[in-house]
Amino acid sequence: MKAHQSLHVVAGFVRFPMSKTGQSRCYSILKDISIPASKQKFVPSSGTYPKGFLAAGAHAGVKESNTQFPDVALICSETPCSAAAVFTTNKFQAAPVQVSKQVLEAREGADITGVVINSGCANAVTGKGGLEDAKSMSAKVDECNGTPSTSSKRPSTLVMSTGVIGQRLPIEKILNTIPVAHSSLSSTHKAWLTAARAICTTDTFPKLLSRTFTLPSSPNHTYRIAGMTKGAGMIHPNMATLLGILCTDVPISPAALKLLLSHAVSRSFNCISIDGDTSTNDTVALLANGAAGGQTITTPSSPNYAAMQTVLTSFAQSLAQLVVRDGEGATKFVTVRVLNSPSQADARAIASTIARSPLVKTALYGKDANWGRILCAIGYTQGIQAGTVVPERTSVSFKPVDGSEELKLLVNGEPEIVDEERAARILQDEDLEIVVDLGGGERGEEGMGGEEGIYWFCDFSHEYVTINGDYRT
C-alpha cells in the first residue's frame, strides 16, 4: 500500500537577496549568497517539519573571508532518536566521518540526540588533532543538551564537516558558536532554512524539503519528514557524494532505519553525478524520534515498512536531484535511463558511465546532439556481463520534457537521420532525458532481461573550471 504524501516546495525566496543580474553564479557562497533567478523556485518559502526536531544556524567565521553568514548548523531532537547513516567510501575518510561512525557503533544506532555541521573546512586529512576537534564538537553539543559525554557516558551527537581538505578547523570559533546556535534552536521554517544555508559551500541555494504523509496502520495520522543537503561539486556516489540530514517523527527501530536508509540511498544519492569525484567527508544521516506516535517499524515485515520505504526513497530522490540542479556551473538537468538490461547492476553501470563522461557533458552544454559520445560511453563501460551490450540491438533517443515524441538517434544499431533543428530545440531546455534501450527484450526471455537503471547528472560548462580553479581563493 502506498503512503499519501504532500510535498512542501513553494516557489519564491524570502531572505537571501537576488543578484543584480539575476543570473550570476556565486563562486564562493561565503562572499556572495546571491541566488540566481533560475534557482529561486527550488527554495521553499514554507514547510511542515517533524515533531520534536529543532534546527538552527549561526556564524562562526570558519573561513576568514566569511564575516557574517551562518556556517555552523545544529539539528537536535527533544527526545533521543534512532539513527542510521551511510558514509563515503573514499579511503581518506575525514575526522567527522570517523567520529560519527564511532558514535553510531557505540550506541548501536539508538539514543542519538542530533547532528552538528560546519561548512568552510572539511577537517579531512588532519591527523589526530582533527579527530579531537570532531569529538569536541560532538561533546559541546551534548553539553548544551544537558547530557555531557564522559568516560562512562558515550557521545550522542553526530558530526559533519564540509569545505577545504587538509586544513585544521578553527575549533575555538566553532566551540564558542555552538552554544549560540543551540540557544536559537527552533521548529520554525526560518530556523530550518538558516541551518540549510549554514551547510552550503559552493552551492547557489540552500536545499531544504519537507513532506507530510500517512501510513497504512494509521490512515488518519499525519507524519512528517524533512531534510537538507549540500553539494554542488565533488559529486559521484559510492556512498556518498555530499552531506544530507533527514529527520522524521515516525517511530522506527535502529535496525529497520538502517535498512530503510540503505535502500533509499542506493536509489537516490547513489544515482547522481556532477563530476565523477567522491569526497572524503560525505555522509547521509537519517534520524527518527517517534514523536508522532503510532506503531513502531521494527522489521521489513512491519505493517508500515513498505509504505515508509516508498516515502523515504521518493523523498531522498527529490533531495538528491536538488544537488544535481545546483551542480557547479551546470545549465542542464539530465536523466539517463537504460532499459532492457540483463541486470539492474549492468543498467546502472552503463547509466553511471554516461553520466560521468566529460565528452557527453560538454556536448550537452554546447547543445550538440552528438550521440556518438553517448554510444562511446556505453561501449567502454567496465564490469558488465558479456552480451549486455550488443550493437545490433542498441537504441538511443532524446526524450523531450514537453511530452512530445522521442527524437530517435540510433535504432537497433542503425543511425537515424536526425532533425538537427528539432534536436537543437530539445537541447535548449534545462531538462532532458536520454533513453538507452539495450534491446534485451522482456524479462524471462533466454539470455535477455528487462532490467532498468537510472542516473541524474548535469552538463560541464566553462564555469565549472572557473569555480574549481578559484575554490581556495
From Swiss-Prot:
Consult the record and explain the modifications the protein receives after translation: The alpha and beta chains are autoproteolytically processed from a single precursor protein within the mitochondrion.
The record's annotation in SUPFAM superfamilies points to: DmpA/ArgJ-like (SSF56266)
Protein name in the entry: Arginine biosynthesis bifunctional protein ArgJ, mitochondrial
A cellular component term from Gene Ontology for this protein is: mitochondrial matrix
Q: Which GO terms describe its molecular function?
A: glutamate N-acetyltransferase activity; L-glutamate N-acetyltransferase activity
Assembly notes: Heterodimer of an alpha and a beta chain.
Sorted alphabetically, the keyword list is:
Acyltransferase, Amino-acid biosynthesis, Arginine biosynthesis, Autocatalytic cleavage, Mitochondrion, Multifunctional enzyme, Transferase
